[in-house]
């Protein structure tokens, strides 16, 4: 595919540092769609590390089944579309409408072996086409930055799963190519504005330069706090299934485990809550439950925010190292009756979890599944477990965690790795494909964002994503908070019911705190 030779221009400006990126996001982005905030924090100290913000997007790339829609959000983005239109792939059907192009990919042959399937033409190639269309000759970090979401349901393009009802507008993936990016280093207290020009349009070059200066000036202004529109009207938390129904599903799945169909499975349930001030709820969630991965995604069809403890897949192109971070084993934090932390009780709960045979067996099973996932895509002999059975603690729960790493095979890229590993075993079970088939059968509806991944990748090859858990998907003013529990042969259904609510509680409480005064339910 032909390249936009030497058309890439990068404008970088240092700007005023602000310690609260949520307020900065509100100040610069407001309620505009195609904006995104990604944040990282230390697991133990909870200190902010880095915040990356897509302030303006050049294009939006979304997929539903085997159809990919690429929409230009600026004349800058339209330059990329014009190159893609000149170089259509022979096996892809191509349609153009207004400022969008649609690519219809051929259906995958599910009978192919894993090695052939990974190289088959798929919706992931739409990103490769875009990245190849612009030549990054200077190899600048984050110069071509895609931020967004891979949904759980994307897997149905690659595996034979039962059909499910689609009740949300969430696409199979949705990513924005950054036109204006803000990179905040909280350790060094620095802020960098980075704007990317993808074509030769002089007017666009001047507009983007002016926009960069405008953002620089905006960051010199006093930032206004996020409005909190609280109400005293009582609100009822609802769920798609009752505790009894969820317990019944767990028991049915345990019978299949007894028969040997699967070893473990992760059924989930949905909780619903009104939410018309998502950014305020996200701010409350960050305060109460700082996590390694925090995110706020603002799309034309939905808002997604959360604080996830679990990396999905991480890839560093420099050393070709790929990482998985399985989390399995959960307990509530030890608290006194007044809600304050009881350190003695907390440590006893941790000890019980660390020595619980059921939890350890479940965790090690998923570590083994992560090892198997990496074995298919890593150089022989490069895969190993770098951390085994540690404990990470958050506001409402603590988890058993491990880390599995390896060196990606030459000839594969980060998107090959993600497509091969999705969805993560801690959200499906084992064996993975059969567990996902049973999840589709018993849940009966798409999971959407839940259990997929959110994060970023660049044209230099790096990728960093987290599993979309401890999150809220907001559509038409209603938040869906989804949570599950890992079920094995000796699971106690009543405990798994409680675990699903414990996992959702931090997000539920954050939404309530942002919207409702004390005393409302």
Curated annotation (Swiss-Prot):
Q: What modulates its activity?
A: Feedback inhibited by tryptophan.
Give me the residues that bind chorismate, please. 329-330, 450, 470, 484-486
Q: Which Gene3D superfamilies match?
A: Anthranilate synthase
Q: Which UniProt keywords apply?
A: Amino-acid biosynthesis, Aromatic amino acid biosynthesis, Lyase, Magnesium, Metal-binding, Plasmid, Tryptophan biosynthesis
Q: What enzyme category does the UniProt record give? A: lyase
Q: Which residues bind Mg(2+)?
A: 362, 499
* One Pfam family of this chain: Chorismate_bind
Q: What is its EC number?
A: 4.1.3.27
Catalyses which reaction(s): chorismate + L-glutamine = anthranilate + pyruvate + L-glutamate + H(+)
Under the heading SUPFAM superfamilies, the entry gives: ADC synthase (SSF56322)
Give me any GO biological process, just one. Answer: L-tryptophan biosynthetic process
Pathway(s) = Amino-acid biosynthesis; L-tryptophan biosynthesis; L-tryptophan from chorismate: step 1/5
Q: Name one GO molecular function term.
A: metal ion binding
Q: Which InterPro entries match?
A: ADC_synthase, Anth_synth_I-like, Anth_synth_I_N, Anth_synth_I_TrpE, Chorismate_C
Report residues binding L-tryptophan.
Answer: 40, 292-294
- Note the PANTHER family from the entry: AMINOBENZOATE/ANTHRANILATE SYNTHASE, ANTHRANILATE SYNTHASE COMPONENT 1
Quaternary structure annotation from Swiss-Prot or TrEMBL: Heterotetramer consisting of two non-identical subunits: a beta subunit (TrpG) and a large alpha subunit (TrpE).
Q: According to its UniProt record, which protein family does this protein belong to?
A: Belongs to the anthranilate synthase component I family.
Name of this protein: Anthranilate synthase component 1
Query: Which organism does this record belong to?
Result: Buchnera aphidicola subsp. Acyrthosiphon pisum (strain APS)
Q: What high-level taxonomic lineage is stated for the organism?
A: Bacteria, Pseudomonadati, Pseudomonadota, Gammaproteobacteria, Enterobacterales
Q: Which gene is annotated as encoding this protein in its UniProt record? A: trpE
């Amino acid at each position: 595919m032909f390249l936009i030779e030497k058309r890439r221009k990068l404008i970088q400006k240092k700007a005023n540092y602000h310690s609260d990126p949520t307020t900065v996001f509100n100040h610069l982005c407001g309620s505009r769609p195609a904006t995104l905030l990604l944040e990282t924090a230390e697991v133990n100290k909870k200190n902010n590390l880095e915040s990356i913000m897509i302030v303006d997007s050049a294009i939006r790339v979304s997929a539903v089944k085997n159809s990919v829609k690429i929409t230009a959000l600026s004349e800058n983005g339209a330059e990329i579309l014009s190159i893609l239109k000149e170089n259509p792939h022979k096996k892809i059907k191509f349609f153009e409408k207004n400022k969008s192009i649609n690519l219809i990919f051929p259906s995958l042959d599910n009978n192919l072996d894993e090695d052939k399937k990974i190289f088959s033409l798929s919706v992931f190639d739409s990103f490769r086409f875009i990245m190849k269309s612009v030549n990054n000759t200077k190899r600048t970090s984050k110069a071509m930055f895609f931020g967004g979401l891979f949904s759980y349901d994307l897997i149905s393009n690659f595996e034979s799963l039962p059909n499910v009802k689609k009740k949300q507008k969430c696409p199979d993936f949705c990513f924005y190519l950054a036109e204006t990016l803000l990179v905040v280093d909280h350790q060094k207290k620095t802020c960098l504005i980075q704007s990317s020009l993808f074509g030769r349009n002089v007017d666009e070059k001047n507009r983007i330069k002016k926009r960069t200066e405008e953002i620089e000036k905006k960051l010199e202004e006093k930032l206004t706090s996020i409005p909190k529109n609280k109400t005293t009207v009582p609100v009822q938390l609802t769920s798609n299934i009752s505790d009894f129904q969820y317990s019944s599903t767990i028991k049915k799945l345990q019978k299949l485990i007894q028969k040997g169909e699967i070893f473990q499975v992760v059924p989930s349930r949905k909780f619903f809550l009104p939410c018309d001030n998502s950014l305020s709820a996200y701010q409350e969630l960050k305060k109460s439950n700082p996590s390694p991965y925090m995110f706020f995604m603002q799309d034309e069809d939905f808002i997604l925010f959360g604080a996830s403890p679990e990396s999905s897949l991480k890839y560093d192109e420099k050393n070709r190292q790929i990482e998985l971070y399985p989390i399995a084993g959960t307990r509530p934090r030890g608290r006194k009756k007044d809600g304050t932390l009881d350190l003695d009780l907390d440590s006893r709960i941790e000890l019980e979890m660390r020595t619980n045979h059921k939890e350890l067996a479940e965790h090690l099973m998923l570590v083994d599944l992560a090892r198997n996932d990496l074995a298919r895509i890593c150089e022989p002999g490069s895969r190993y477990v770098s951390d085994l059975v540690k404990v990470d603690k958050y506001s409402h729960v603590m988890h058993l965690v491990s880390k599995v790493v390896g060196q990606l095979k030459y000839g594969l890229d980060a998107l090959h790795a993600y497509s091969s590993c999705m969805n993560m075993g801690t959200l499906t079970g084992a064996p993975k494909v059969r567990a996902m088939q049973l999840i589709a059968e018993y849940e009966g509806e798409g999971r959407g964002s839940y259990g997929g991944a959110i994060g970023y990748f660049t044209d230099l090859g790096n990728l960093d994503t987290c599993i979309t858990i401890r999150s809220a998907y907001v559509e038409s003013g209603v938040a869906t908070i989804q949570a599950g529990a890992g079920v094995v042969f000796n699971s106690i259904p009543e405990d798994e019911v409680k675990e699903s609510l414990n996992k959702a509680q931090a997000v539920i409480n954050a939404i309530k705190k942002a919207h409702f005064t004390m005393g409302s339910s």
